């Protein structure tokens, strides 16, 4: 049985591998999305993105969307603009439904950072969203796969 920890202490890594790629849940200062939770997605040294969560409203899924959809950060290659040279298009910033699962792959939506960390997080559209993001400074730096597995560091 894997060690457990609180959501705020857990690090999630891609199930398919991915080197230094990590996902960490954080508290949001601006709860305008209706949730006090978000996450930081680190894809490479000096390349990190903040996402906010929009909670589910009954039948709908919870959703993760880029919290700061302006220009993407500088990549290790030093590029700011998209490879095509186009300006970022409104509304195409990365987003995905987000699903949380326990050890038996039952839904396990956390209430806050002190809640037990779910074993797995599923972001089914995130990799594709990065591929089609017009402001992506480096399409080679994108999340791999959609399943993220908890690491409590024990």
What is each model feature region?
Residues 2-79:
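N-terminal secretory signal peptides
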Residues 3-7, 13, 92, 124-125, ...:
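Alpha-helical protein-protein interaction elements
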Residues 4, 17-19, 59-61, 70, ...:
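Exposed regions on extracellular, virion, or secretory-pathway luminal proteins
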Residues 100-154:
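Glycine-rich, aromatic-bearing surface loops/beta-hairpins
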